[in-house]
Amino acid sequence: MTMMDMNFKYCHKIMKKHSKSFSYAFDLLPEDQRKAVWAIYAVCRKIDDSIDVYGDIQFLNQIKEDIQSIEKYPYEYHHFQSDRRIMMALQHVAQHKNIAFQSFYNLIDTVYKDQHFTMFETDAELFGYCYGVAGTVGEVLTPILSDHETHQTYDVARRLGESLQLINILRDVGEDFENERIYFSKQRLKQYEVDIAEVYQNGVNNHYIDLWEYYAAIAEKDFRDVMDQIKVFSIEAQPIIELAARIYIEILDEVRQANYTLHERVFVEKRKKAKLFHEINSKYHRI
């Protein structure tokens, strides 16, 4: 195993640890594509964790400087400051793919702002956040998952990322509240007459369910729109993207089956993932 192979293996471990659903799906890509996904996921995870886990703004700055070095001089040797193994893997990817570096910087800017979290006044602010933390990831992955990236390809990948982030929010309402965060907008909370603290303390009510389903309908519509345009991605990537997205959309039904609980994180069981895999395998005849 070469040093570069070890770098990619390190990135893969990060992906498997933090997103079993993504790993389950994207590990089915051809080797070069899945390695690129591992590297990009690992970079994005380190960006997220720099503040959420480490509380280290200097580390986030180092990540940004390392990415800037790769963008400016992709073929030169660099003394990376953040995580050398991840950055070497990203540099290798950047030498072969047209990486959307600005999307990395947009993600970093969102993480900067997230240090001083305040509730969103409107849904527009919420959806802007979903773009910043997840739509950006879709943009960065676009050259990996398509043969000829176009404006439409970037748009579809961005919407998929935003949809998956909204699903994360719908899954983690209780956990986020425990961390003193409420992502639903004040505008929508007022409209549906919902107080998250009250729901957390006293249990789910019809007002909360209606609010939750309002946002779930948005995520489900975006999912359907993405599936309708799945052919913008490469033949190899189409079934993988559909598998990842369908596993994620299943999370919404898991929340429903758990009676919209705020006190337990739901997940999609392995047998359901396997069932989806076989359905999509039959549809595409190529996974």
Curated annotation (Swiss-Prot):
Annotated PROSITE patterns: SQUALEN_PHYTOEN_SYN_1
Top-rank taxon, per record: Bacteria
Entry keyword set: Carotenoid biosynthesis, Magnesium, Metal-binding, Transferase, Virulence
Cofactor: Mg(2+)
Gene3D superfamilies in alphabetical order: Farnesyl Diphosphate Synthase
Similarity field: Belongs to the phytoene/squalene synthase family. CrtM subfamily.
Binding-site list for Mg(2+) 2: N168, D172
Lineage of origin: Bacteria, Bacillati, Bacillota, Bacilli, Bacillales
InterPro entries reported in the protein's UniProt record: Isoprenoid_synthase_dom_sf, Squ/phyt_synthse, Squalene/phytoene_synthase_CS, Trans_IPPS_bact-type, Trans_IPPS_HH
Pfam families assigned to the protein according to its UniProt record, in alphabetical order: SQS_PSY (PF00494)
EC class name: transferase
Gene Ontology molecular function: geranylgeranyl diphosphate synthase activity; metal ion binding; squalene synthase [NAD(P)H] activity
Binding site for Mg(2+) 1: D48, D52
Biochemical pathway: Carotenoid biosynthesis; staphyloxanthin biosynthesis; staphyloxanthin from farnesyl diphosphate: step 1/5
Protein name: 4,4'-diapophytoene synthase
